């Protein structure tokens, strides 16, 4: 029983932190920039003090820890 629980925790953790492809991250990031900037043009760069870009798969969308600048 414990083994099953551990397996499920590992499985769901991987689902949350794995991104299907970098393309969906770029697309999501571009959408965020368009929402934040009136002209719809923006470049996405990693946030400062973010050692590594974090990808999360949530509700079939990929999100990234990025800011628009």
Curated annotation (Swiss-Prot):
* Signal peptide limits: 1-15
Q: Which GO terms describe its cellular component?
A: extracellular region
In the record, biological process GO terms are: defense response to fungus; killing of cells of another organism
Q: Which UniProt keywords apply?
A: Antimicrobial, Disulfide bond, Fungicide, Plant defense, Secreted, Signal
**Compartments reported by the entry:** Secreted
Give the main localization category. secreted
The highest taxon in the source lineage is Eukaryota
The answer to whether the entry has keyword Signal is yes
The disulfide bonds in this chain are 19-68, 24-44, 29-62, 33-64
Family, per entry: Belongs to the DEFL family.
In its UniProt entry, what is this protein called?
Answer: Defensin-like protein 166
Q: What is the phylogenetic placement of the source species in the record?
A: Eukaryota, Viridiplantae, Streptophyta, Embryophyta, Tracheophyta
């Amino acid at each position: 029983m414990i083994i099953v629980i551990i397996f499920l925790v590992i499985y769901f953790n991987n689902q949350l932190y794995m991104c299907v492809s970098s393309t969906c991250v770029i697309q999501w990031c571009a959408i965020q920039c368009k929402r934040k900037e009136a002209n719809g043009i923006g470049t996405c760069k990693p946030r400062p003090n973010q050692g590594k870009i974090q990808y999360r798969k949530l509700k079939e969308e990929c999100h990234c820890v990025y800011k628009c600048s």
